[in-house]
Amino acid sequence: MEEQKFHSLVKALNEHEGIEEVFLLNKDGSIIYKSGEFSLTDDEAKSILSAWKEKEPSLSFQNFRFAILKNDDLQLAAKNIGKGKGNIVGSITREGDYLIAHTRDEALILLEWSIFINKVAWS
């Protein structure tokens, strides 16, 4: 995916309040683009994608655990339970990359975020 398209997807995601960070990973879990300066290492990105692909029960982001509630080949939906650290949602893109966002518990509920990121990723 070209950088300009990534930034247009980030803009579309920001239609709703609650988007914290957005990042794009390739099929190996390497970071292609990030929506801003935030802490995300290549190892952490690879771990998130591995949890998604391997259908693990949880993933870690910024040292917080997120329980994976929806996990299929196209979409990911995970929630931080008890610590108030929001959600991780993701969708595969037309190009085969993985668009992932960290959201707050505002505007949309977790499954709505999951559907929304999928809609944006395929636009």
Curated annotation (Swiss-Prot):
Places the protein is found? Cytoplasm, Cytoskeleton
GO molecular function (one): actin binding
Q: Does the keyword Cytoplasm apply?
A: yes
Fetch the InterPro entries from UniProt: PFN_sf
Q: Answer yes or no on keyword Cytoplasm.
A: yes
State the UniProt keywords alphabetically.
Answer: Actin-binding, Cytoplasm, Cytoskeleton
Main subcellular location of this protein, as a coarse class: cytoplasm
Q: Which Gene3D superfamilies does the UniProt record give? A: Dynein light chain 2a, cytoplasmic
Q: What family is it from?
A: Belongs to the Asgard profilin family.
What more does the entry say?
It is not clear if Loki profilins 1, 2 and 3 are from the same strain.
Its annotated function is as follows: Binds to actin and affects the structure of the cytoskeleton. At high concentrations inhibits spontaneous rabbit actin nucleation. This strongly suggests this archaea has a profilin-regulated actin system, and actin-type genes can be identified in this organism.
Report what the protein is called: Loki profilin-3
